[in-house]
Amino acid sequence: MIPRKRYGSKNTDQGVYLGLSKTQVLSPATAGSSSSDIAPLPPPVTLVPPPPDTMSCRDRTQEFLSACKSLQTRQNGIQTNKPALRAVRQRSEFTLMAKRIGKDLSNTFAKLEKLTILAKRKSLFDDKAVEIEELTYIIKQDINSLNKQIAQLQDFVRAKGSQSGRHLQTHSNTIVVSLQSKLASMSNDFKSVLEVRTENLKQQRSRREQFSRAPVSALPLAPNHLGGGAVVLGAESHASKDVAIDMMDSRTSQQLQLIDEQDSYIQSRADTMQNIESTIVELGSIFQQLAHMVKEQEETIQRIDENVLGAQLDVEAAHSEILKYFQSVTSNRWLMVKIFLILIVFFIIFVVFLA
């Protein structure tokens, strides 16, 4: 092994490594002569870098605790706001119910307009009785349904009135009264249309009787038809003994068929008028309920009016007291003298000491 000589003073400075060491290869003779002077050098130490998968750790427990505390306070804030959220939810439910009732009212108004157009027709041959009866039945069912929905909405307002404010409850009652007034107006229009339809049916019946009475009276019945015997009006005796044709039998059958048709028509019109009368009676019950609701609102308005009158009396009493005090102040001459003296003293002080 060939010994090497390291120049430590040139490559290190107070224990700091300055770079690669400079070594010098010595000959064997030189190595033998200097072996007594230089001790053998230790093997060079190689620096091993840390493994790449090793990571530094940091304690983040406090951050986790602070995040938990913030989440807990947020949940507590949500719990404290639950009454407000409940009130908003109830208000939105009331709004949806009122919106649904308003939409149903508009649809029923459209059906009522169509029924009005059909009911005002006075033509005898352009009478759409089936369509009119269907629309009448549908509108009657819609009015009953709307009446029930408005009653449910009013019960909802009464049940939730204690939880909401006074102004909010007044606004809700105003909306309910507005819907009730619209339903009453529509019911009144429906009643008027049914009355017009009844008058038209009476006119059509009288006109049909006028047109059908003359042929019925002009064509007499055969005397043996109701007795069940054979109808024989006459037969001519010819030499060829031909069979006589009975023409009166066909006329009599047509006459009876016409009478049956008239009876069925009159019966159908009677049923229609009965339905109209029952519908008018139901509308009367709806008007009674509406009158009861309006009576309740009238009592509320009377209480508000009494409160306004009481407040007005209090304001007038306060005004009279203020006038009395003002008169007493103006009549007090000593007070005016004192004020005048204070002004004079203030003027003298201002002129003498501050000028």
Swiss-Prot record:
Region feature Disordered, mapped onto this chain: 28-51
Superkingdom to which the source organism belongs: Eukaryota
Main location: endoplasmic reticulum
SMART domains in UniProt: t_SNARE
Domain t-SNARE coiled-coil homology: 263-325
Stated induction or repression of this protein's expression: (Microbial infection) By human cytomegalovirus infection.
Molecular function per GO: cadherin binding; SNAP receptor activity; SNARE binding
Mutagenesis / variant outcome for changing residue 247 to A: Loss of interaction with SEC24C
Vesicular side: 355
Protein name: Syntaxin-5
Species name: Homo sapiens (Human)
Gene: STX5
